[in-house]
Structures are given as C-alpha cells and as structure tokens.
Amino acid sequence: KDGEWFKCGVKDVRSAINNIRERKFSIETRGLNFKMRPEQKAAIEKTFNYFQNYKKENPDKTPHFLWNAKMRFGKTFATYQLAKKMGWTKILVMTFKPAVESAWDDDLKEHVDFEGWQFVSASENTLWHEDIDERRPFVCFGSFQDYLGKNKSTGGIKTKNKWVHETKWDCVVFDEYHYGAWRENAKELFEAEDKEE
C-alpha cells in the first residue's frame, strides 16, 4: 500500500506491455495482440473479394457468405478483422446460442486491433444502445429469440428492440445459426428478405 508495488492480474500486465511497446497509453486494458493465422487471412480475403465483386455485379442485392469454419477457427476475431477491412462500422451479430456472447465481447474489448470499438447488448455489463457513440464502430449482439420475438400486447416488435430493426446495418452475422435454422422465426426472416430482393 502506498508503495511502488501494485496488485494486478496477468491481463493488466499484458496490456501494459502492449501499450509501452506500441507507445499507446490508454485507460482500456487490451492485453491481446496476436496476429491472424493464415487460414483466417485466407477466409477474410476470399470474403472481401466476394463482397466487392458481388456488389459490382448485383448493386441492388445483398451479398451472403457462409464461413463453414471448424471449431477453434477464431470466427469472432476473423469477423472483426473482416469488418475493419470492409470499413463496416455497424455490425449486428445474431445467434440462437446466447452463451457465445462473452467470446464476441472479449475479442472486441481485449484485442489491440479493435481499440475504440463498442460492444452493445442487453446484458448488464455492456454498453446500452442509448450510449452508443455513432462516430465510432459498434457491434450489437443479441439472440434471434429476443430480436425476432413479438410484443405480447401488440403483436409487433418489442419496444426495446425497435432500434435494432430501424438501424441500417453494414453487416449482419448469424452465429451458431445451425442451433435454430429450422425454426419458423428464422424461415420468416429469410422469406421476407427474399421478397424484398
């Protein structure tokens, strides 16, 4: 106490080392600075090229791309790197498996590559949509069950989720989609999109 020794964790030490190495001095504790693996770089490059070419050939349609990635591929990290490369600033991540939220949150908040990015969800320990700084990139995470759920009294969109439906997203990511792809909500979502296109 009141000396030159301070209690801290490994994460704090890594963050301090990274900040000194990169001559950055930030309040945020970002202890991760690993680089992309070759298979992640290849997936990002392939996806980037597909999106660029698709938009040229189909300017009025929305491109879709599936990463059929193995376990431990690092989809969250690779998705964020793709978002940076594409220049996306508003990313919606929807899942049928809400337990994966921490992976999306941790990669965004702890890796040095995503400094300044914001993570929004309905969880208590994250930013709320009212607090988003629109000048900075943000990722909104939520479950299909919540975002596609109906207001019981009106039959319409839940009031708390209205902003999600009204936002023009640069990218919508479906994570762990196979857990609920067969459900009616998911089918209705894609049938409505196909009609619009």
Identify the residue ranges that each predicted region occupies.
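Non-catalytic accessory segments flanking enzymatic or RNA/DNA-binding domains
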Residues: 2-38
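Alpha-helical scaffold elements adjacent to nucleotide-binding pockets in ATP/GTP-utilizing enzyme cores
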Residues: 82, 103-111, 140, 172, ...
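Walker A/P-loop
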Residues: 54-82
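SF2 helicase catalytic motif II
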Residues: 144-146, 161-197
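N-terminal pre-P-loop "Q-motif" helix
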Residues: 34-61
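Inter-Walker segment of RecA-like/P-loop motor cores
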Residues: 112-156
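Conserved Walker A/P-loop ATP-binding site and its immediately adjacent core
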Residues: 72, 76-113, 146
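Residue-level preference for the first positions of well-ordered beta-strands
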Residues: 64-66, 90-92, 138-139, 171
